[in-house]
């Protein structure tokens, strides 16, 4: 599939604008994930999907239907499902263009959100320390399937973002330092041949060259430093 970053970014923003302009659903959706990190916390890679938390389970049916209405304005809805843990949609806005996945998580982890504004649109956005915690857990759970989370964890570590250790411990059922040790072990076993899987097309050429050569070892090094600081 072809990825036209300019077009894709425009449609992502239009969907967000429509979503957060709808007062019947906007108070119940917490924006998170890679696109939120790109827009509000300086993440230096492109992001292609939209991720939210559902903040009031009693509004699930209404939110599910309203998001269908929003997404249909921008193309063909190829999928709209209520999965075990999420509301899930796949939007095709052009033939041969990259699809947009929208996922609304229904699980509660005590995450916090604050109002932030992007190009005049106010959105409820997950605070950075909670976002970092969920990114670390995503890397731990999906390592070997996609390296997108590895890049994001490197970004949060490199830029010295705080992390909500309680969320990490709640999700992993491990102490924070034990989870860090596990992540280090997982990365040490990860082949560099797969380090661009799921993230390569979202990086510039120079970023790809750097990631291929350095991402895995730099992330391991920063995790070890973080682990050392916990002692």
Q: What are these regions, as identified by a protein language model?
A:
Residues 1-29, 43, 55-57, 61-231:
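Structured mid-to-C-terminal alpha-helical surface segments
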């Amino acid at each position: 599939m072809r990825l036209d970053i300019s077009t894709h970014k425009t449609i992502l923003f239009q969907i967000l604008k429509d979503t957060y302009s709808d007062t019947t659903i906007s108070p119940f959706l917490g924006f998170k994930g890679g696109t939120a990190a790109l827009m509000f916390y300086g993440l230096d890679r492109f992001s292609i999907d939209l991720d939210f938390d559902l903040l009031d389970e009693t509004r699930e049916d209404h939110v599910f239907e309203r998001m269908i209405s929003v997404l249909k304005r921008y193309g063909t809805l190829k999928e709209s499902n209520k999965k075990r843990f999420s509301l899930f949609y796949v939007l095709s806005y052009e033939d041969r263009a990259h699809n947009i996945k929208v996922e609304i998580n229904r699980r509660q982890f005590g995450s916090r959100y604050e109002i932030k504004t992007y190009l005049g649109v106010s959105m409820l956005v997950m605070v950075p320390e909670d976002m970092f915690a969920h990114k670390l857990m995503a890397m731990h759970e999906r390592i070997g399937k996609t390296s997108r989370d590895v890049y994001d964890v490197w970004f949060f570590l490199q830029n010295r973002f705080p992390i909500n250790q309680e969320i990490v411990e709640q999700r992993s059922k491990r102490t924070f330092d034990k989870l860090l040790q596990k992540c280090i072990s997982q990365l040490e076993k990860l082949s560099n041949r797969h380090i661009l899987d799921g993230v390569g097309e979202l990086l510039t050429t120079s970023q790809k060259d750097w990631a291929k050569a350095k991402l895995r070892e730099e992330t391991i090094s920063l995790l070890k430093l973080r682990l050392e600081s916990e002692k």
